């Protein structure tokens, strides 16, 4: 149980996928202009990333490894992620049309988020069990969501701030992301595995 808590804290704070491993930067910069859209993307990513981490583990352990075709893991994981995203979109559309309308384009965009594939591959590299893979996926998603929502709130504040003209837009956003990353570096000594 302690190991699962360490994995969770490590993936959320210490080894954050966006700020430390630089995975998922595209949605981090692209969807963080408004807090509402960032929250929708964070919710969808959390569900899909956790589920795809578990499904990728199962596909590797019970399909690829027994057949001796481990070299197909990347393409298999991409297909698993695409299937999870499509099933998630169909389930959300069927059960809650309002939520589907709110999430809109964000669900299909998760398929191209490199953090989702990164979690599947890093799970394999770290030789996590099924439960550890689920916690690792959830922690990575929670860390991604935390940083995305924080960054979106900061960007909304920057829109009304008196920023010099040359620094407006992407320039001040990248500087802000760097400062946010330095803030998360303070968690580096928190977990020792």
From Swiss-Prot:
Listed GO biological process terms: electron transport chain
Membrane topology: Multi-pass membrane protein
Matching PANTHER family: INTEGRAL MEMBRANE PROTEIN OF SOXR-REDUCING COMPLEX, ION-TRANSLOCATING OXIDOREDUCTASE COMPLEX SUBUNIT A
Keyword flag Isomerase: no
Record keywords: Cell inner membrane, Cell membrane, Electron transport, Membrane, Translocase, Transmembrane, Transmembrane helix, Transport
Subunit details: The complex is composed of six subunits: RnfA, RnfB, RnfC, RnfD, RnfE and RnfG.
UniProt subcellular location: Cell inner membrane
EC number(s) reported in the record: 7.-.-.-
Record keyword Transmembrane helix present: yes
Function: Part of a membrane-bound complex that couples electron transfer with translocation of ions across the membrane.
Family of the protein in this entry: Belongs to the NqrDE/RnfAE family.
UniProt-recorded name of the protein: Ion-translocating oxidoreductase complex subunit A
Alphabetical list of Pfam families matching this protein: Rnf-Nqr
CC terms in the record's Gene Ontology section: plasma membrane
Membrane-spanning intervals of the chain: 4-24, 38-58, 65-85, 102-122, 134-154, 171-191
Class in the EC hierarchy, top level: translocase
